[in-house]
Amino acid sequence: MDAGIYLREIAEQFAKLSLEAVLIGNAAAAIQGAPVTTIDIDFLFRNTPSNIVKLKKLAKAMGLVIFNPLYPASQMFRLMRESDTLQVDFCVRISGIRTYESLRSRATPVSFGDKKLLVASMADIIKSKRAAGRPKDLAVLVTLEEVYAKIQAREKAKAPEPEKAI
């Protein structure tokens, strides 16, 4: 599966619908260079009446079916397309992250075709996986931390030297 094809399609529809969500999980980590895999694409979004309407429009436009597994406990909306097994999960909250706004403030816009998606920072992905504590999340932590260290080193190398007062 080339996730880039799906992410371009999703970014296009988000733009058409003015739907805002932050890409999280292994898909977000892979975009930042982590050698991880996933069978789904996860987003964190605000659970508002208008966003629920937008999710329904997104599902219709992309030929997806909306499921709400474990409702009301999970507050997660799963959108699936049978023809190619695309699975997109929209979470209302995730472990380790206090608010959507805080996650969004640290996210980076990434281009997919001529549209952009917000992608969670590697620090937030690591924090969430550690807080979730599930074996599948803990299994990738060392890999994610190694990639994050490389990201930090690149950012430090790009940062200008602070001016020294004389």
Please state what every model-predicted region is.
Residues 1-166:
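Compositionally biased terminal segments of proteins
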